[in-house]
Amino acid sequence: MGSDWDEIKRLAADFQKAQLTSTLQKLSERNCVEIVTLLLEKQMLEVVFTNDGKEYITPDHLEREIQDELYVNGGRANLVEVSKTLNVDLSRIEVLAERIAAENPSVHLVLGQLIDEDYISHIAQEINEKLVQRGEISISELASQFDLPSDFLQHDVVEKHLGKIIKGRQDASNPRVFFTQAYIQRCKAKIRGALAAITRPINVAVILQQIGVQEKIFHSLLDEIAPAGQVTSKQANSQYVPHIYAKTQADWVNSFYKQNSFLEYDAIQKLGISDAKSYIRKQFPNEEFLFLKRVALGARLVELTVVTALNECSATKQYLDLTTILPSNLSEEDIEEVFSTIMAQKHSNPSNFVYLDGIVFSQPYLAQLVQPCKALAESQAKAAIDGGVYQQYIVEKTLAQKGNVSTQELEDDGKVDKRDERRKKASSGKAGGGAQGRETKTKSTKKHQRGKAAAQFDSDDEDDVQQGTRGGGGASKKAVKPLELVKTADIVKLITASLEEEGLEHLSKPIAALYTNQFNQTALARAQELFEATPQTNRRQTHAAIQDRINTLLIDIRLYEKGLKLFPQDTQTQLVKYLLKSLGNEICNELSLYVASECNLTVKNTNLNVDQRNKLAQECEAQYRAALLEQNKALNKSIDEFELATETVLKSCSMIIKKVDKKKDRLLIADHKRKLQKQLLECHEPALLLHLAALILFTTITGSILHASGKFVSAILQHIRGSLNEEQNALLLRYHDLVLQVLQATPDSNESKLANEHLQAMQTQVVELAQNFSRASVSKAD
């Protein structure tokens, strides 16, 4: 029993020992991979794989290895090389390098490289040694030597250690250059010695080449040295001029200017002065100069000589030879430049003078010289008319312009304009507002020559050469050559004798060329006047007058149409019919009489009815016949259809329809209203007075005009009733009833006499209402 208990104790002790003893078991590679994979999936572990994928490492350990590589490489490590050495992807290396640089102020990340302060101190020592050897160094040289950015070298290396490791100073004018004080002293000594030995002007570049000093240092130290001379500028081609030489130059220039009052740039440049203009300004700071291309003229010479002579020339109406008052060594180009510059600077009007080969002519002198040419232009114009030359010229220009008009129409064929819209409305059979009025060029199928030579142009016709038409196929017409009635040779013959007396006959052709175009235009204008004065041109004037009259009537119809559209449909139809029977009939008569005149038909009665116009149209030429007949039919149709028919007639007559200018509508309406008011003041017949008053009130209230006869007065009063107060309506209604009573009663009856007395008493009130009523007093909204 005791042995069993001992056995139990022994087993318990073994069991306890087994529990307390740690057992080391070696896992297989597969198990390790599975464990690591599981940890990665549960994001309990972060590792970085190598490029071959066989190994991995934690980011912290990789960071330590990057720092070790930085230390091994002497404080400067290229991340690409580190990536190859550690066999880790470059992007991982760059991320950790940025973290290292951010966490450690002594480490810098520069262009894919890690650089620590030890390396910076090392290159600072190298820079200091180089600066001591050379005396001067620039950041660009250091950037090339150390393969580092210039900004990094300047701010984090040189400027940071300047005065500590690097013994030198920074150039104030160029912060990217550094030098030692000893170097500056050596440069000063070289410059001082070189300048002391110079006795004549010499290029600064030559001096710098001899003494081996940089140009920027030379110019910065020059003022400190205070040499016995001066440098012309800080540019590449500057010169050093000793004071003794500069004094000799100044004496010569001063002496020459005092004697001649001008200076030549070439003479100054021969003295060794490169910029003559700047030297003159510097040498004579209180003098005013007129700087030309080759010379500089003093203000004394310009004011006292040239300007005075020009003023005298203008006052005496003569000419001035500038070569006699300017220095003899000035060329013709110099003299012309003097004249042009004086005209600009002195604010003179160049049109008062004419410059030719060194001689200035006043305009009155030339006008007197060419005075005989006016008679020449008159005689040439008469000869052109008598010989038919001008008429032939007009015919050619007429044909050329018609060709241009045809081309313009072809180009406009594809455009949808207001004519198309109106044509659609007319075809739909709806009456209403026309949209006529745009300016459209039309051409006849027959060449109309109104008069002997188709006088289709004004006196402006003799301007430039007419341009050829631009057809779609590329064909172009030949340009019409301008008519030359007065030629240069004709003017030369007239003025040569006068110029020979002054010894200026060599200028006869240039002077004649100046006035050829002027007198030719004068002759053409005179020829046009003579041409228009002939009986053949009366038809052209009639054409223009008819065209203007028709356009005016069409504009009136358009404005009246807006007013009648405000009425109910039944009243509107009657107003349209009345409008066409009155104004439309007038348009038909005007065009029918014009066409009859074109076709050489005799018309005894000018007030034609529809049958007479139809009969007349049958006798006209075929190109007019259909259009006139259609226009007569359109009088019984809508306004749109009538306007389209009228447009066709105008086209056959080579007339244009003026473009609608709605900005002028208000002016036309206001003018129409003023005319009605004037008639109202002069009217004493009750029925007409009421008619005029109703039309005026309608225009004031609606802003539109109306063309209506007396039978529409009641409809007009009914339309405007809502815009008048009770007293005004009662006045008009009472006056209307009295007018009807007078019209219905016999003239001599007591009823008629009594009604006339009442009308006479109320006349002043009706007139005042029509004259003084304004839209501001309208009780209802318009």
UniProtKB/Swiss-Prot annotation:
Similarity section: Belongs to the UFL1 family.
InterPro entries listed in its UniProt record: Ufl1, Ufl1-like_C, Ufl1_dom, Ufl1_N
Recorded GO CC terms: endoplasmic reticulum membrane
Disulfide-bonded cysteines: none
Its job: E3 UFM1-protein ligase that mediates ufmylation of target proteins.
Alphabetized UniProt keyword annotations: Transferase, Ubl conjugation pathway
Organism this protein belongs to: Drosophila sechellia (Fruit fly)
Record has Nucleotidyltransferase as a keyword: no
Region (Disordered): 405-478
Organism lineage string: Eukaryota, Metazoa, Ecdysozoa, Arthropoda, Hexapoda
Protein name (Swiss-Prot/TrEMBL): E3 UFM1-protein ligase 1 homolog
EC number: 2.3.2.-
GO biological process, one term: response to endoplasmic reticulum stress
GO molecular function (one): UFM1 ligase activity
